[in-house]
Design a protein with these regions (language model features):
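N-terminal Rossmann-fold NAD(P) dinucleotide-binding loop
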Residues: 3
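Glycine-rich FAD pyrophosphate-binding loop
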Residues: 11-33
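Mid-domain catalytic core of redox enzymes
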Residues: 13, 215-321, 325-334, 338, ...
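Feature captures the FAD/FMN-dependent oxidoreductase FAD-binding
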Residues: 52-66, 71-81, 120, 124-126, ...
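Active-site/ligand-binding neighborhood in enzyme catalytic cores
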Residues: 100-219, 245
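FAD-binding beta-loop-beta segment adjacent to the flavin cofactor pocket
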Residues: 310-315, 367-396
């Protein structure tokens, strides 16, 4: 999304754009898949905000999401999130104690575990927040930066306001999905007809003639501390700037001519497995999202998408997406689709007793790069990355490129802002191109290039982007 957002913005500003994509299709994981039985699967985000839809120009092609809520499954019971947990006495008392302690002492939070206990109290932190964090990150909370907590909560008052607005308007008001722009009752979730890929298709409009698929970027070239171009399919394209959306640990490997970014190769992303279960019936989970922090479950999150978007499955049927944290090559990663489906069904019996009789099959996605992991060991370097790459004319944008937990609206907004800043700093602009990184099929590279050049021109005014 970041690559297309950047290319689209530059194209609208009169800069010619060519898109080089390493894979055989654009949009990466921001795609929808439809099977012959009438089920739709979205890998990545399931919905966007109406504000983003209007901004991109697909507002009239979206359906309003009327309901969204989360629950936590704990001790065989379901608790609404966040307010249901507040009615558990031990969690309420522990939470008050933590707040009082915070007012009377100034203990520094050095780890994610410290942050959760200070924010929620020991009971909720130890039973819910910390186990969930460790499940999706694959790291101990004591080894994670307290920055994990950044942006998790809008605050009780703000959350209550947005939840009340959602009930009154009968729309899924955005709560915790936007950081760059304010969340308010008028900002709610919508689903593009045809799937989330509709957003990417709209951003790609007008770029058809310049999109080049199966064109991986092999190297980003740096000379005298400046990004000066890229090598694509063995050919060099000179550049005045490079805007990368590649995972930062990939960026650190493909930069040639400086060792300033070698430390980025230590940054970790959490691999994930998403198992989409097809089931008979609907309303099988307590609500749209059910978090499962207890160690008895091999998964940490369940999402029954049809409770928000009933059109994603045939009438009388549903899809439940099961999120499993893993590592490449581990037991889960090596399981085939049938085995993963069976494992999920077996472990869902505690929540859906008759799930076996409802099971119709599954579809599975495995991705080696799902979420950035904020380890303390490279926290200083991560914070430095927030200020820039340290290489002149080399920018890193997007969820993976910024190594940040941001959602689609923020990805789009931040990509455009970076492009705006870039154009403001260029005295002369003649062209742009976009292309893809070598390590994964989902990464893009974008840049400015001569309007009349073909694959490997010598134009100096070029910005490059990798997603």
């Amino acid at each position: 999304l970041a690559g297309l957002s950047a290319a689209n913005y530059l194209h609208r500003k009169g800069v010619s754009v060519i898109l080089y994509e390493a894979g055989n299709k654009i949009a990466g994981l921001a795609q929808s898949f439809h099977d012959t039985d009438g089920f739709t699967y979205d890998f990545g985000a399931h919905f966007i905000t109406n504000r983003l839809a209007k901004k991109v120009g697909i507002e009239d092609k979206c359906r309003t999401v009327k309901h969204y809520a989360e629950t936590v499954w704990l001790g065989g019971k379901s608790y609404s999130h966040p307010f249901g947990l507040m009615r558990v006495p031990r969690m309420t008392m522990s939470g008050f104690a933590a707040k009082f302690k915070g007012l009377t002492s100034k203990n520094k939070t050095e780890t994610a575990a410290d942050w959760f206990r200070a924010a929620y109290g020991e009971a909720l932190a130890d039973e819910v927040a910390i186990p969930l964090t460790e499940a999706w990150s694959g790291a101990k909370a004591a080894d994670l930066s307290p920055a994990v907590g950044d942006g998790i909560s809008n605050g009780i008052g703000r959350t209550l306001l947005l939840k009340m607005a959602s009930r009154l308007t009968r729309r899924a008001v955005s709560c915790g999905y936007s950081r760059e722009l304010p969340e308010k009752p008028s900002v709610y979730h919508v689903y593009p007809m045809g799937g989330i890929g509709t957003l990417c298709q709209k951003l790609a409009e007008g770029l058809d003639d310049v999109i080049k698929l199966e064109s991986p970027v092999e190297k980003i070239l740096v000379e005298n501390g400046k990004a000066v171009g890229v090598r694509v399919n063995g050919k060099i394209q000179e550049a005045s700037a490079v805007i990368s959306t590649a995972p930062v640990n990939v960026l650190g490997k493909i930069v040639e001519g400086t060792d300033k970014l070698e430390h980025l190769t230590r940054f970790r992303y959490r691999p994930m497995i998403f198992v989409n279960l097809r089931l008979k019936g609907r309303g099988l989970l307590p609500d749209v999202v059910t978090w499962t922090p207890e160690s008895e479950f091999p998964f940490f999150r369940l999402t029954e998408t049809t409770l928000s978007m009933p059109w994603l499955a045939p009438e009388g049927k549903t899809v439940i997406t099961v999120d499993i944290g893993c590592e490449k090559g581990d037991e889960f990663w090596q399981m085939d689709d049938e085995a993963l489906g069976e494992m999920c069904v077996e472990n869902l019996k505690a929540i859906i007793p008759d799930v076996r009789s409802r099971y119709l099959g599954c579809r599975v996605l495995k991705t080696p790069i799902a979420y950035p992991v904020f380890l303390r060991e490279y926290e200083a370097e991560r914070r430095a990355l927030m200020e820039g790459t340290g290489v002149e004319n080399l920018y890193s944008i997007g969820r993976n490129g910024e190594f940040s937990h941001i959602f689609m609206e923020d990805v789009h907004y931040r990509a455009e802002q970076k492009m705006k800043q870039h154009l403001n700093h260029l005295e002369t602009i003649e062209n742009i191109f976009t292309s893809s990184a070598p390590s994964t099929k989902n990464h893009l590279i974008a840049g400015l290039f001569d309007k009349d050049s073909n694959t490997a021109g010598k134009d100096k005014n070029i910005a490059v982007e990798v997603e």
